[in-house]
Every structure is written in structure tokens, then in C-alpha cells.
Amino acid sequence: MTRYVCISLAVLLLIPGAFAQQSFRVEKDLLGEKQIPANAYYGVQTARALENFPISGVLINHYPGFVEAWAIVKLAAAQANTDVGAMKPEKLATIEKACQAVRGGKYHDQFLVDWYQGGAGTSTNMNANEVLANIALELTGHKKGEYQFVDPHDDLNMSQSTNDTYPTAIKVAFLLRNDKLIEEMQKLVASFRAKGDAYLEIVKMGRTEMQDAVPMTVGQEFHAFAAGLEAEIQLLHDAEKYLYPVNMGATAIGTGINVPKGYPEKCAEHLAKLTGKPIVPASDMLAATWDQQGFVAYSAALKSLAVKLSKISSDLILLTSGPRAGLFEINLPPLQPGSSIMPGKVNPVMPEVMNIVAFRVMGNDQSVGLAAHHGQLQLNAYEPLAGLAVIESQALIYYTSILFRTKCVDGITVNEKTLEHYMETTVGIVTALNPIIGYEKSTELAGEAYKSGKGILEIIREKKILTEQQIKELLDPVKLTGLDRSKYEKKPQQ
């Protein structure tokens, strides 16, 4: 329903007489004149995009970081143009005020074009140009549409093309949010570490291929979850470097037509200052204008993280299964009734939604790959899809991880009696007897245990294979886990 409301409102804004008190201004482009709502900050090209692409209802302002990124790119471009003498300082001052207003969260409701669009992102670039130009006009006492004073093309798009601003804005959007994503992953790691410390010496059975294997501790299991996520954090750091090179100054195809000398370097320099990231000009502008390596690499890192989160979530779902006819090794916080027909049922909704998000991220990564390889010749026209896929993946993982941590992981408890029962009745500890009585005799013991339903320890005592002292020394559950407590001790900060 939301989709159709968004589309309908966007289109209604363009229909004369749709609202009784609505007034309009007239703007024109190469296709002719068009009425634009007088209070709209966008212009004629945005209006055409609203008519041409009422597709998903997911507008570019759905992700505020993307709108903020456009303001940063346009500000850096204006600053660079001023540095090289192409723009007057007075005009820069006006454009800077407009860009800073958008960076501060204002006027985002004017960034209305749909993410799904043809034209390699031209609709989005012009939406940004027109809105920022009209904000600048108002700030200097002019009316919207008086482009002889501040022009969307000549001023906001000076020394630029959609083909360099669009990929750069997407990269900036990713960079602005990557630190937050990493910070949240670090919090999730800390939560798993805390659970690992709390249950460090609680022994349980490890399983391979869903069958009992050898003993481990609950703490080891949770610390392993944390270690796995730490590897993904490093991958996010590593992937970020592929977002640093930008093709600002490439303009249409990478040859830099209409670009003043020194502009690419100055633009990257200003982008670095505005973002706090080491952004640099791409070494080959022609390649950078069609090459999607940055999107592919960062999307791959997000996919890898999603795979890890999904695996951990699936483990939690298994470990909490039951409560009477499943593993029931851990308890997850009960969040909501789980069934409209089965009384008392509570489902593991947080791990499940993490699975769902992970599946979406994996699908998005596939879309990024398809978009990346399908661009023809000197430009990739499918960057809007790649950009949306990655920015959505980034946001989904970030927000879901907050919920997963606070509503699930932080509240996990362990059913120690269940684990004790499993350890008493398991056949898994028979592996520890291999060095003592050999593999064949150990196998015979395991077979007897399965047939009789007895535990290994019970059979060992019946057959007097080991003395009680030997059992204590050789089959101590904690010793069998190989637990190295020093591995998990917090190191004092230097």
C-alpha cells in the first residue's frame, strides 16, 4: 500500500488542478515546457523522472545517507571549481549553505525520484542539482526557478557528469555508514564474548553433521561465534579501500571533457576532508567510469558477513529447539506469542529475521554482480541497481544486528541440567579412549552403548576398563574440551 501512496503523491504533484490551492511555475528543457508545483524545490527534469519511473515507491530519500552523500559530492565539486578559478567564491558560499542544509537533514522530502530508473542515474543527479539550486536561490532572496542566478546545470553540475557524480555519491554513502556498521558488529562481538565468559566452563557436546562428536564448552562455542564475526569486521575494513578511488573529473566517459586542470585532485581532496576518508582520484578515469570493482568488493564483504550471521542464527535456532522435544540447550528471550493456533508456543523470531535479512543480502549481492558485468563499453548504466542493492544490504544488516544483539544475544541463558544429561548419556567421549584401548575397541564400546542405551562411562565402569582415578584423569569433561582459559582472559590495556 505504501508503494502506491508514494507513487500517487509524486504523480499528483505534477497534475494541474490536483489540489485546489496548488500554484505552479513553468520550467522548460529540450522536450518543452512543464508546470512545476510552485513550492517544489525540484525542477523539470525531476518532474519528468517522477512521471517516467513510478515503479517501486522506494525513493532515493528512503536512505538519508544517500541524500547526504549527494550534498557532500556537490559541495566538494563546487569547492574544487572555486579552487581552480572556474566558480566565483560568492557562488560557492551560496551553494555551500544549500549543501550544508541538506547534510543537516533538511529538504530530504524533495529528493523524490525512484531508485529504479533508466539513464545511469541522471534522474537522481538532476534531482540533486535542481533541489540544491533552488535552495541556493531562496537563500539569496530569489525565487525558485530563477536559474539565471544559480543554475542546476551550469553551477551545480559544473565540471561534472552523472557518470562521475553518481558512482561517487554511492561510494560516499557506503563510506559514511561503514564505520557505524563496524561499530555495531564490534558490539555484537562483545555480546558473544560476554556470553562466552559467563559460560566458559559449562561442558556440552559438540556436534558434526548433526551427530554427537566430542565435548566442548558453551563458552568456547560463543567465543567462536565472536571470532567468526571479528574476521568479518576485518573484511569490512579491507573492502573499504576499494571505495576510496573516485572518478570525479572523468565526466562523460573518463576523458575529462570540460574539466579544468587540477579539478579532479582538488575534488578528491575536498571529499576526503568532508568524509574523513582517504578518498583519491582514480588512477585511470576511463576504467573507473565503467568498472564496478568498488561495489562488487564491498557487496561481497556484506554477503560474507550475512552468511556468517545467518549461520550463527541457524545454530541458535537449533540450540533452543524444543523445549521438550528438541535440543533445548539454551533459552532465547521470549519476545512474542508464536502461534495463532498453538497455545504457549514461542518462536526464535530474532534469529529467524536475521536469516531472512541474510538471504536478502545474498540476493542483493547477486544483483550487484549482474549489474556490474552487464554495463556496455564506456559506462555502466545499471549503477542504480547496484547502488540500491548495496545500500539496502548495509542498512538491513546494521538495523537487524542491533535488534539481534539487544533482543536476543544479550538475553541468552543456558540450560545446564540439559547439558549435564547429554554429557552423562553421550557416546561422544569414547573418542578420548582411542589412545588408551585403540580405535577398534572404542568402536565396540560405542556400538554397545548405542544398542543398550547405556552411557559410555556406565559401560566402562561395568567392564572395569578404567579405574575411577583413571576416569577422573582421562575422561574429565573439561579436560577433554582442551579449554585454554588464558586464551579468553582479557589482556590489560597498554
Q: Locations of the language-model features?
A:
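Positively charged n-region of N-terminal signal peptides that target proteins for export
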Residues: M1-V5
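Bacterial N-terminal signal peptides
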Residues: C6-G17
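Conserved, well-structured ligand/cofactor-binding cores
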Residues: Q21-Q494
